[in-house]
């Protein structure tokens, strides 16, 4: 992706988030974006929209199906994408919208990787640690289970990581022995 395309994607995302923020609709926008991104993942819609082999009329039909129960701002955004024939960039734009929402609201997704599933009490403690250590509000808590950690956990928020896993400690110990 070129810098020009990246700038275009970011501009569309910022504009949509600004409009939703002005009308206090960030939560609704975030829900819409997550639902549409889920559709992209389950149907490989991104390939169809970015393919030159798919006629523009078909792309219009596909995006019209996405409009469904979305907010007015999301539907207007999808109409704008169709008018400007930018549907090939829609998936990246929606991801950029989530990033912009996180920046504006200081609310980031938290990924927790542990050797066992977390209890509700542990999840609330993770949210407290994130608020204290990273000075952000925890958005969605994405839980991953990786038995190779042996014990402990890895918390990732906004490109920052806390790794207290036994696996990492063993690796560090191994490096110290060399």
Curated annotation (Swiss-Prot):
InterPro entries: ATP_synth_OSCP/delta_N_sf, ATPase_OSCP/dsu. GO terms for molecular function: proton-transporting ATP synthase activity, rotational mechanism. SUPFAM superfamilies: N-terminal domain of the delta subunit of the F1F0-ATP synthase. One of its GO terms (cellular component) is proton-transporting ATP synthase complex. It comes from the Bacteria. It is a peripheral membrane protein. Keywords: ATP synthesis, Cell membrane, CF(1), Hydrogen ion transport, Ion transport, Membrane, Transport. Its main location: membrane. It is found in: Cell membrane. The keyword Transport applies. F-type ATPases have 2 components, F(1) - the catalytic core - and F(0) - the membrane proton channel. F(1) has five subunits: alpha(3), beta(3), gamma(1), delta(1), epsilon(1). F(0) has three main subunits: a(1), b(2) and c(10-14). The alpha and beta chains form an alternating ring which encloses part of the gamma chain. F(1) is attached to F(0) by a central stalk formed by the gamma and epsilon chains, while a peripheral stalk is formed by the delta and b chains. F(1)F(0) ATP synthase produces ATP from ADP in the presence of a proton or sodium gradient. F-type ATPases consist of two structural domains, F(1) containing the extramembraneous catalytic core and F(0) containing the membrane proton channel, linked together by a central stalk and a peripheral stalk. During catalysis, ATP synthesis in the catalytic domain of F(1) is coupled via a rotary mechanism of the central stalk subunits to proton translocation. This protein is part of the stalk that links CF(0) to CF(1). It either transmits conformational changes from CF(0) to CF(1) or is implicated in proton conduction. Belongs to the ATPase delta chain family. This is ATP synthase subunit delta. It comes from Streptococcus pyogenes serotype M49 (strain NZ131). The lineage of its organism: Bacteria, Bacillati, Bacillota, Bacilli, Lactobacillales. The gene is atpH.
């Amino acid at each position: 992706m070129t810098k020009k395309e990246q700038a275009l994607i970011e501009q569309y995302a910022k504009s949509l988030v600004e409009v939703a923020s002005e009308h206090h609709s960030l939560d609704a926008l975030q829900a819409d974006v997550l639902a549409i991104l889920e559709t992209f993942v389950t149907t490989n819609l991104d390939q169809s929209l970015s393919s030159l082999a798919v006629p523009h009329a078909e792309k219009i039909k596909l995006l019209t199906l996405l409009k469904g129960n979305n907010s007015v701002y999301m539907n207007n955004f999808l109409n704008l994408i169709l008018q400007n024939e930018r549907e090939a960039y829609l998936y990246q734009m929606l991801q950029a919208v989530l990033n912009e929402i996180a920046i504006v609201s200081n609310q980031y997704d938290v990924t927790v990787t542990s050797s066992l599933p977390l209890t509700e009490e542990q999840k609330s403690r993770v949210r407290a640690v994130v608020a204290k250590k990273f000075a952000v509000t925890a958005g969605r808590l994405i839980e991953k289970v990786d038995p190779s950690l042996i014990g402990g956990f890895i918390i990732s928020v906004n490109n920052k990581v806390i790794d207290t896993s036994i696996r990492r400690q063993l690796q560090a110990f191994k490096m110290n022995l060399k």
